[in-house]
Amino acid sequence: MKNLILICAFIVGLSTYAQNTIKQDLGDFNTLKVYNGIELELVKSSSQKIEITGEKANLVKIKNVNNTLKLSLPFSLKPSDNSAEGKILVKLYYNKNIDLIDVNEGATITGKNFNQDKVSLNAQERGFINLTTKTKYLSIRATSGGIIKVSGTSKNQEVDLDLYGIYHGFNLQSTGNTNVKAGTGAKAEVNAGETLNAKVSFGGTIFYKGNPEVVKDKKVIGGIIEKRN
């Protein structure tokens, strides 16, 4: 009898897992946007597909229009259904370049070995991006408490932060040009290569490592530009 109960519990567990696992093939896309606290992992693959697990997996809205893939939750009058709350985990398998990665509303995107010639990373509304990459041109934009962390290599990087946006880039080796702007309450950490063009305003902060041959800095109404060892 005890064994029968255990077997039934195991079957129910498998059924529950299956109900909360969604798999779907995807068409082409070059822009990725994620919302509502959804946690997503990028996985380089030979095909394009998505796998969603977690208690709220069935709530995720997948929309792929005009090469833009959006993952979000539909609006609900029940506040708890408007946020993933750690109950949605997504694995996104891709085989083509993703030109723009954009996180919003506390969503998270992570990935390793994200290697392509150029990529733009945007984070806002407490969204978080954490990537390891090898690229020639990297564009960073963070605002409204968005956080971006990048390690690896890039020839050139363009960083634009405002409204308490944060960029952790000390572990990104840049060999060429680094242009950084940090506005209200924003903070940038960069590893500069040949040149550094830094501009802060309204209490922004830029910390940099490396020994750039040319350093141009401009401060407007406060702010900090400082070299770190």
Region spans (language model):
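First exposed extracellular module after export/assembly in secreted or surface-exposed proteins
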Residues: 58, 128-131, 190, 205
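Acidic (Asp/Glu) and glycine-rich low-complexity loops/linkers
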Residues: 5, 19-104, 108-122, 132-139, ...
